[in-house]
C-alpha cells in the first residue's frame, strides 16, 4: 500500500509526502529484525541486490551510515532510533530538506509483516522514493525467502 498526497502537484508545495509500503515475508521475523538492526550491513544481511555497500561513518553523536544503492546513488543516513522491543528502526537522510524513515518488523501468521514508512520534503521526491522503497521491500522478500 502506498499513501501519497492525492492533491494536484501545484497545490502540494507545502505538503509533506508520507509514503507507506508493506510486504509479507515468509521468514522468521526475528531473523529479519536482526538483519535490519545491523545498520552497517544492509548490503549483505537485509537487502543484497538493492544496496551494494554500507559504511559506518566515524564521528560523535548518533551513528551515521553511508548507503550505496545498486543504481549508484549514495546517501548518508543518521540512525535516530533502534527499538528492539517494537522491532523498529528510524533514520533520517541528511541531504533531504526533511526525511524520517521507519522500518518495522511484526510477527504474522507464517512469517513477518514488514512496513517501511517515509515522511519527506520536498514532496516531489516521493515520485522517486516510493518506487525505490517498493523495490527494496521486494528485494528483501526475495532475499529472505531465497527466491532471488
Q: For the regions a protein language model found, what residue spans apply to each?
A:
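Glycine-rich portal/gate segments that line the openings of hydrophobic small-molecule binding cavities
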Residues: 40-44, 51-97, 113, 120, ...
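Hydrophobic/aromatic beta-strand elements that line small-molecule binding cavities or substrate pockets
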Residues: 21-23, 77-81, 100-107
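Hydrophobic-ligand-binding modules of eukaryotic lipid transfer/binding families
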Residues: 2-24, 108-113, 128-134, 146-148
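Hydrophobic ligand-binding cavity/cleft-lining segments
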Residues: 2-57
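Residue-level signal for tight coil/turn positions that link beta-strands
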Residues: 20, 27, 60, 84-86, ...
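Short, intrinsically disordered, mixed-charge
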Residues: 34-41, 84, 134-138, 142-146
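Beta-strand/loop substructures that line and gate deep hydrophobic ligand-binding cavities in soluble
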Residues: 90-143
Amino acid at each position: 500500500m502506498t499513501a501519497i498526497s492525492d492533491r494536484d502537484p501545484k497545490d502540494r508545495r507545502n505538503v509533506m509526502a508520507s509514503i507507506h509500503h508493506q510486504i509479507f515475508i515468509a521468514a522468521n521475523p526475528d531473523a529479519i529484525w536482526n538483519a535490519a538492526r545491523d545498520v552497517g550491513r544492509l548490503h549483505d544481511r537485509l537487502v543484497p541486490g538493492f544496496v551494494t555497500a554500507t559504511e559506518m561513518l566515524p564521528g560523535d553523536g548518533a551513528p551515521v551510515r553511508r548507503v550505496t544503492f545498486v543504481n549508484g546513488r549514495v546517501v548518508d543516513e543518521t540512525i535516530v532510533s533502534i527499538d528492539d522491543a517494537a522491532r523498529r528502526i528510524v533514520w533520517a537522510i541528511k541531504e533531504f530538506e526533511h526525511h524520517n524513515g521507519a522500518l518495522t518488523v511484526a510477527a504474522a501468521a507464517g512469517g513477518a509483516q514488514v512496513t517501511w514508512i517515509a515522511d519527506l520534503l520536498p514532496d516531489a521526491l516521493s515520485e522517486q522514493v516510493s518506487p525505490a522503497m517498493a523495490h527494496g521491500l521486494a528485494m528483501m522478500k526475495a532475499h529472505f525467502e531465497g527466491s532471488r
